[in-house]
Each structure stands twice: as C-alpha cells, then as structure tokens.
Amino acid sequence: RKSLEVVERITGVEIPFYEADIRDTDTLRDIFKQEEPTGVIHFAGLKAVGESTRIPLAYYDNNIAGTVSLLKAMEENNCKNIIFSSSATVYGDPHTVPILEDFPLSVTNPYGRTKLMLEEILTDIYKADSEWNVVLLRYFNPIGAHESSDLGENPNGIPNNLLPYVTQVAVGKL
C-alpha cells in the first residue's frame, strides 16, 4: 500500500485500491463491474523460486488458479487486454548468455513452471478469441527507482535478489 501512496503523490492521481484474493472470482467480478477497466497489467502472484520448491501447491494454487480466476472476470466483463508478468525463469539454466527470446524453454522449478503454464493458457485464450490482446514479459529481476528516490525496491529484511542486497549494504541497512 505504501508504494501505491507514493505513486499517487508523484502523479497527483488517486488510484483505486482493492485488497482481495485473486482466486476470489466473485470479488474480481464486482471490481470489474465497478471500475470497468479496459486492460490489466498482471503482477499478482507468489514469486520466490526457492520457496516454490518447498511449497509448490501454494504456487500452483495462487499463481495458476488465481490467474484463471482473473481471466474469467476479465472475459465476463469484456476486458480482453492483458500484460502478463512472466519470468526469464522459463528458460531454465541456459548454456550461453545473453539469453535470446527464442531460446528453448526449460523450466527448473515450480515458480517458473507456473509462469510457463500461464503463458500457454494466455496463448490458448488468444488463439480461441483473437479479440484478446496479450503481452508476455519475460524479464529478469528488475531494479531501479524513481528519480525522486521515493519509489524503488526497498525490501523488508534481507532481500532475495542480489542488487537490492547490494543497495541495502551500500546505504548501511545490512
């Protein structure tokens, strides 16, 4: 919620906020009816690779079932534009770098598997109904901050990713 407040302050625009479980299709339907969005940027999901190997069912339930719930609500409200936050983990452990978009897919963990499954689900939806506009983003861990430095990755505790860890050390927090 804090990040949303910073975005509102920076942009001067109030952003509607709903705290809900992405797997709750009825609540999502109500939100879509209320807000009438024309598109969705989908970042919701569990995202720790290591954790996904310990509790894979939680990842499948939240990431897969949650996204299917979201897609149902979108379709029922004629919202057929989605940008999906996938992951470079769908490439597994490539033999060379840099990784190119057309490299073979080789998932090595449940988190990456949920991302690949969802890419396939979204591709199937598009093939079945070309009114859908689907963008799949396969990026690595992004890092950066707004020029004001009011908005950027500021993890609680010890970060899971290298660059946020380095920045925390640099500013004396670790």
Q: Can you say where each PLM-predicted feature lies in the sequence?
A:
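NAD(P)-dependent short-chain dehydrogenase/reductase
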Residues: 123-174
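N-terminal Rossmann-like NAD(P)+-binding domain of SDR-like oxidoreductases, especially those catalyzing
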Residues: 1-145
